[in-house]
A protein has these predicted regions:
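Intrinsically disordered, low-complexity regulatory regions
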Residues: 1-132
Length: 132
């Protein structure tokens, strides 16, 4: 059987990490929206700046906030995982402090509205920095 984790398709660098975005999805039992956010926070693409990722993260958070305003959340919050395991999982990623905060908000804040709003604010800060 082919080792699909030994390479990636496209310009992302997931395969060079011990823990890939798939591992985060499975460990934290993420819904599709949160899995997409996690992927965008973790990835580095040789062909793109982070600007587009931050814009997409902000957009996805906006959609989740819209869903939450419409009624009860159809998705469960991420499964709690000990912080020490989280720290081990991100160890070989060169995350900016803002990116780590994005991930922590996504994975650990139980108030989902607060999590998504915080993430939008962090993205606004990163977008402003990248455009300056």
């Amino acid at each position: 059987m082919e080792n699909v984790r030994s390479y990636n398709v496209g310009a992302s660098d997931y395969s060079k990490h011990k823990y890939q975005s798939w591992d985060f999805w499975l460990t934290f039992v993420l819904n599709p929206f949160d899995a997409d956010l996690c992927k965008r926070i973790l990835r580095t693409k040789a062909t793109d700046t982070r600007l587009l990722d931050y814009q997409k993260i902000k957009h996805i958070c906006g959609e989740r906030l819209r869903q939450l305003e419409e009624g009860p959340d159809k998705w469960v919050s991420p499964k709690y995982v000990e912080k020490s395991h989280f720290e081990e999982m991100i160890l070989d990623y060169s995350l900016l402090e803002d990116d780590k905060q994005l991930l922590e908000n996504l994975l650990y804040l139980q108030n989902r509205k607060e999590a998504y709003k915080n993430m939008q604010n962090i993205c606004d800060k990163r977008i402003a920095y990248l455009l300056s």
